[in-house]
Amino acid sequence: MKKIILAAGGTGGHFFPAVALGEELVKRGYEVHFITDLRCQKYINQNLGLIFHILDLKRSSNIFLFLPNLSIAILKAIKLLYNIRSSAIIGFGSYPVISSMFAAVFLRVPIIIHEQNSYLGKVNKFFASFAKRIAISYEEVKNLPEFAKSKIVVTGGIVRENIRELDSIVYSASHRGLITGSKKIKKRLDSVVTPQNDKLFTIFIFGGSQGATLFSELIPASIQILMQKQPNLKLNIIQQAALDDQVKIKDIYSKLNINYECAEFFDNMALQYKEADVVISRAGASTIEELTYIGLPAIFIPLPSAADNHQYYNAKLLEDKKAGWCLEQSDISAGKLADKILDLISNPKILEEASKNLLKRRKEGHVLLSDLIEGVIYHPVA
């Protein structure tokens, strides 16, 4: 049985796409080893059929501390990769994979890079010269070295299986309506919507660990303004929020007499995606690929501190394709967000167009990348 190594950081944005790829490779008969860091421990499910290895690399801005840590991590990675003896390693970028990628270079293990964002990250750019192939999610990726362009293969992003199963739900702006005054607002076709939510326009808000605090202040304020402008709106709000913020948020929504669900973490995002008419979120690659796959439109507020400002480029690319909306954090206000939400509710055809444009980008990334890996293994390239 041939062995394949996946190297990915321990945050959900890197971890879940790598797991989805691993599951596909296991189905194809490979023994899959997953090298990651300590942050992923809350996600690890031993029933996935993957063999996990924790190889932590402590980040430090002090070069005199980082280099010794990196050297130790590389030696550990060399020992690990030597024992595994894999046919290929797939790197998903981010600093935790550096040691594994250096080890692969040293041991001459064929390297494939997967770039999820529309901007090639520093780690992936560094190892691009050693890679056999570079798989990308977007047709247009910034920061690509000229020499790397011949290695590029567009595979699309990789989406978790439970999200891919939502493919049967059709987004339609002309099926069900909700009434706001005398205006009829169209709603998406959703076979799982419950009778009590039949006429509610549902907004799903999540920001991850780096977005929840901002959203806990911005979103309720926006909804208050929205309800002042349109008191008859029938809304359903699903919002991720830190425990410390939930009392305040629930109090605001209760006083507005709107339906809401507020939680610190959603274990199964598919359930929330099923209910949503529009999403408000950060613009991480994993989030964008999931929304793209199911054609669910979103208002993106990119995280300004994201490496290389990649979230802005992700969101702006979709906005340019009329497949989403990008509102920069430095320029946003509760009033501007309320106006954008009201515009979308009042013009459902805009939502439907965005959904169609998202679906035009969809690819079966887990299949295409697995095919690419097999091509490198069985038909080696220079």
UniProtKB/Swiss-Prot annotation:
Pathway in which the depicted protein is active: Cell wall biogenesis; peptidoglycan biosynthesis
Signal sequence coordinates: none
UniProtKB keywords: Cell cycle, Cell division, Cell inner membrane, Cell membrane, Cell shape, Cell wall biogenesis/degradation, Glycosyltransferase, Membrane, Peptidoglycan synthesis, Transferase
E.C. code: 2.4.1.227
Biological process per Gene Ontology, one example term: regulation of cell shape
Membrane topology classification: Peripheral membrane protein
Subcellular location: Cell inner membrane
Catalytic activity: di-trans,octa-cis-undecaprenyl diphospho-N-acetyl-alpha-D-muramoyl-L-alanyl-D-glutamyl-meso-2,6-diaminopimeloyl-D-alanyl-D-alanine + UDP-N-acetyl-alpha-D-glucosamine = di-trans,octa-cis-undecaprenyl diphospho-[N-acetyl-alpha-D-glucosaminyl-(1->4)]-N-acetyl-alpha-D-muramoyl-L-alanyl-D-glutamyl-meso-2,6-diaminopimeloyl-D-alanyl-D-alanine + UDP + H(+)
Positions bound to UDP-N-acetyl-alpha-D-glucosamine: T11, G12, G13, N117, R160, S209, Q311
GO cellular component labels: plasma membrane
CDD domains: GT28_MurG
InterPro entries: GlcNAc_MurG, Glyco_trans_28_C, GlycoTrans_28_N
Any one GO MF annotation of this record: undecaprenyldiphospho-muramoylpentapeptide beta-N-acetylglucosaminyltransferase activity
Transmembrane parts of this sequence: none
Pfam families in the record: Glyco_tran_28_C (PF04101), Glyco_transf_28 (PF03033)
PANTHER family, alphabetized: GLYCOSYLTRANSFERASE, UDP-N-ACETYLGLUCOSAMINE--N-ACETYLMURAMYL-(PENTAPEPTIDE) PYROPHOSPHORYL-UNDECAPRENOL N-ACETYLGLUCOSAMINE TRANSFERASE 1
Family: Belongs to the glycosyltransferase 28 family. MurG subfamily.
Function: Cell wall formation. Catalyzes the transfer of a GlcNAc subunit on undecaprenyl-pyrophosphoryl-MurNAc-pentapeptide (lipid intermediate I) to form undecaprenyl-pyrophosphoryl-MurNAc-(pentapeptide)GlcNAc (lipid intermediate II).
Protein's recorded name: UDP-N-acetylglucosamine--N-acetylmuramyl-(pentapeptide) pyrophosphoryl-undecaprenol N-acetylglucosamine transferase
